[in-house]
Regions:
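Short coil/turn motifs that cap or connect alpha-helices
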Residues: 78, 169-171
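Short glycine/proline-centered loop/turn elements that form peptide/ligand docking sites
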Residues: 156-160
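Short, Lys/Arg-enriched, Gly/Pro-containing loop segments at transmembrane-helix junctions
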Residues: 256-262
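Glycine-rich helix-loop "coupling/hinge" segments at transmembrane-helix boundaries
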Residues: 26-27, 104, 201-227
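Membrane-water interface segments at the C-terminal ends of transmembrane alpha-helices
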Residues: 1-27, 39-154, 178, 182-202, ...
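Glycine/proline-centered hinge or cleavage motifs at structural transition points of membrane proteins
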Residues: 167-169, 181
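Juxtamembrane intracellular "pre-TM" segments in multi-pass secondary transporters
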Residues: 34-36
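The alpha-helix within a helix-turn-helix
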Residues: 164
């Protein structure tokens, strides 16, 4: 039973990828379609924009969720459970809904624009820019990372921190030398997932990316509007390779970090 199950699982995951790779190499450009991703300005710009946006979202998410996760795990206060429920609420929303919420906040008739207009500094609108995408991606990324960090923070040994303090280490030194190394595997793993999710996010980008191009939207355009199936497949494979490599590298680094810490 094990071998058939593995075979079916491998076929389920690998055959679509193999088919996608073949389609990407059989269009008008042939295998050169993969090279065109980095030599054609519009594709390269979309790729770089997506990578930069994903890196920025990941870095910001790790800082915010890292601090919030440790704080929420170590402190009990009135309303904590309600706050946790509210923080995890974005997990229930599809990307299109999150994009709509960003528009309600920072769109042409959004709350932020109305407030800035009342203050006499003009109507601030950024929902349809890279800043709007950043806000939307950050909104759905933070809950995922907070839950992971809280689980890791629960396993922190307070005795190690007390020992460091007794040796004269200040608060920042304790964070740098004790807390961060202990949380490193969780930070690396959750950061990689955050990056991969941001790279492939479509619903939020579809709602907000009217004036900017990110890779999922370019793939959608090539596939549906231009009927350029081969180029859409090549772009999809490149996107998949980048995210797969990131996740594989994070597993290796997180494993090595955990082994060193242990």
């Amino acid at each position: 039973m094990v071998v058939p199950a593995i075979s079916v699982g491998a076929a389920f995951f690998l055959l679509p990828l193999a088919r996608l790779a073949v389609v990407g190499a059989t269009g008008p450009l042939g295998p050169q379609a993969y090279l065109a991703v980095v030599t054609t300005p519009q594709y390269l710009e979309a790729l770089l924009s997506t990578v930069v946006l994903s890196v920025a979202v990941t870095a910001t998410t790790l800082v915010i969720a890292g601090i919030a996760g440790v704080f929420l795990e170590r402190n009990r206060f009135l309303g904590r459970e309600a706050l946790l429920s509210m923080l995890t609420l974005p997990l229930a929303f599809p990307g299109v809904v999150i994009g709509f919420m960003v528009i309600m906040l920072a769109g042409r008739t959004g709350l932020i624009g109305e407030l800035t207009a009342l203050l006499g500094v003009g109507r601030l609108v950024f929902a349809y820019s890279m800043a709007g995408l950043f806000a939307g991606y950050l909104y759905f990324s933070i809950p995922r990372v907070i839950l992971t960090i809280m689980a890791a923070a629960e396993k922190l040994d307070p005795a190690l921190e007390e020992a460091a303090k007794s040796l004269g280490a200040g608060p920042w030194r304790v964070v740098r030398d004790v807390i961060l190394p202990a949380l490193a595997p969780a930070l690396i793993a959750s950061g990689a997932i955050c990056f991969a999710t941001s790279m492939g996010a479509f619903g939020t980008a579809f709602t907000l990316a009217t004036d900017i191009k990110v890779l999922p939207i370019v793939i959608y355009t090539e596939f549906t509007l231009l009927a350029n199936i081969a180029m859409a497949a090549a772009l999809s494979i490149v996107l998949g390779v980048i995210t797969w490599a990131t996740l594989a590298a994070s597993r290796a680094v997180a494993g090595a970090t955990a082994a060193a810490a242990g």
